[in-house]
Amino acid sequence: YEFRYREADFGNFPRGLMYGLQMFDSWLYDDEKPFIHVEELKTFAFLKEQIGSGYFEELIQKYILDNPHGAIVVIKPEKGRTARLDKELAERLQEYKKSLSEAEVEKIVADTKELIAYQEEPSTKEELEAIPVLEIEDISKEIAPIYNEELHLADTLVVHHDVETNGISYLSLMFDLSDVPEEQLPYVGILQSVIGMIDTNNYAYGELFNEINMSTGGIGTSLEVYPNVTKVSEKEFKAAFEVKTKALYDKLPVAFQMIRELLMESKFEDEKRLEEILALLKSRLQMKFQSSGHMTAVLRAMSYRSPMSQFKDLTNGIAFYEKVCKIADHFEEEKAALIMNLKKLSEQIFRADNMIISCTSRKEGLEELEKLIRELKNGIYQGTADHTPCILHCEKKNEGFQTASKVQYVARTGNFMEE
């Protein structure tokens, strides 16, 4: 909570606006206490003093364990529900139509045509000109300042961004994926989903989550792609397995310790947990495809011609989903290969010579960084791997995918840089 208070990240909302709204939580009820919800450091200090005094145990006992008010809500899936509801709706509409006279049916048809015509009617010039727009003179020609300084700490490239962060260091450890073979890329997507969600040799994954969040603002993993803007026609890009964390300066040692724990101590041989993660991953991908079908269709269509989109499709798109389904649905037959590939990829990716770091902080945030990087490099995989560049094969297709959604998405893509 103290970390979130210091970070004050309100997403797209202006910080001043959110502080103003927080003030009303007390100001509306006491004119003399408008700032108690924005001056929270004293509250954090008080709560720290109560550790070990029984204060928190009493709160839990009174307001949770002994609370007489509660509710249990169960949501159960029903196979074929959409088809059943569609059939019931069709039957109700048919019965309703039978109850109408011929004139009433004709009126509904006419009203529908009028509505469609109204919706498709283009806006007039006067209506379009009434929409507020920015003039070209309103847009600054100056780019925002870029704070990039290349450093070499512990023989590792560190790109430092010196900006005010209120005592927080934002770190991104980037491991190059350019030498991972194409057929292994779906396993990279699974590896990214497994790390942090499975036990390690020293922690159960729930304990690890608590340990990380007690001392840092979290540790997350992602797969990122960066197009080479100087070689657009060659379609070159860089792909990286990124481990991101944010922590107060004095908590950076814990952050690096936990990163090493995730990368080196994860128990990929835990078959039961792997099966659970795959089932969860399969479900989340299905929900993502249904909630953003337009993006799914565009990515798949782009993968026919773009190596970068092909990479995304293999690690987080339809091709990735098909691989996840195959492993999840035939887990007993696939588990040995899955475990072997996760271990093999970890050794190939998380190497000391395969890492660069991005750090956003003030200069004082760098004081211990070189020592921490050296300790991390000594604790992860050593040696070099086969630096054979991965060549992605794009194949033009014409395909469709069926879902339970009532909305259809059709995508046609191309590259304006090509003839």
Regions found by a protein language model. Name each.
Residues 159-161, 221-233, 344-346, 398-401:
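Short beta-strand/turn micro-motifs at beta-sheet edges
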Residues 1-48, 68-78, 84, 166-265, ...:
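M16 family metallopeptidases and their MPP-like homologs
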Residues 28-112, 325-384:
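Ordered core of a single globular domain
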Residues 64, 162-164, 234-236, 348, ...:
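Sterically constrained small-residue positions within well-ordered secondary structures
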